[in-house]
Amino acid sequence: MADRIGKPVSQRQLRVGEMIRQSLGMIFARNEAKVPNLETNTITVTEVKMSQDLKIAKAYVLPLGGKDSELVIKKLKECSFLIRKALSKKIIMKYLPKILFAKDDSFEYAEKIENLIKQTNK
C-alpha cells in the first residue's frame, strides 16, 4: 500500500490512523464534539489516512444512508476545531493532527464495479 507520492505507508501511520478513526467514531456516536445543527451519531468514519509526518489526518466519512453528504462534510469542516478539541481529550500525542474531512466514495465505487460485473456475466 502506498500513498499518493508513491512512498509506502508505515506501520505507525496505519496504527495512528486507526486510533484516530476509532476515537472519531466514539466522539460522533456520543456527540461529544457538540457540533451545532448536526446529528453526529449518524456519521460513519470509514477510514483515516495519515500524512508522513503524522500532522495531517484525512478522515473519510459517510452520513447514514449517504444523504446530505455534502452538507455534513461542510459542517464538519466548519467545526473541525470542536472535533479536534474533543479528540485531544481521547488521544495523547505530541502533535495532534489537523483533521481534514472528505466524503467516502468507496461504497458507491464498489456498487458500480459490482453492477459492471453483473452486466458482463449476462
From Swiss-Prot:
Family, similarity comment: Belongs to the RbfA family.
The entry's keywords: Cytoplasm, Ribosome biogenesis
The keyword Cytoplasm is assigned to this record: yes
Originating organism: Pelagibacter ubique (strain HTCC1062)
An example Gene Ontology molecular-function term: ribosomal small subunit binding
UniProt function note: One of several proteins that assist in the late maturation steps of the functional core of the 30S ribosomal subunit. Associates with free 30S ribosomal subunits (but not with 30S subunits that are part of 70S ribosomes or polysomes). Required for efficient processing of 16S rRNA. May interact with the 5'-terminal helix region of 16S rRNA.
Subcellular location: Cytoplasm
Coiled coil: none
Biological process (GO), any one: maturation of SSU-rRNA
InterPro entries (UniProt xref): KH_dom-like_a/b (IPR015946), RbfA (IPR000238), RbfA_dom_sf (IPR023799)
NCBIfam families: rbfA
Subunit structure: Monomer. Binds 30S ribosomal subunits, but not 50S ribosomal subunits or 70S ribosomes.
Name this protein carries in UniProt: Ribosome-binding factor A
GO CC annotation: cytosol
Any matching Pfam family: RBFA
SUPFAM superfamilies associated with the record: Ribosome-binding factor A, RbfA
The keyword Cytoplasm is assigned to this record: yes
This protein's encoding gene: rbfA
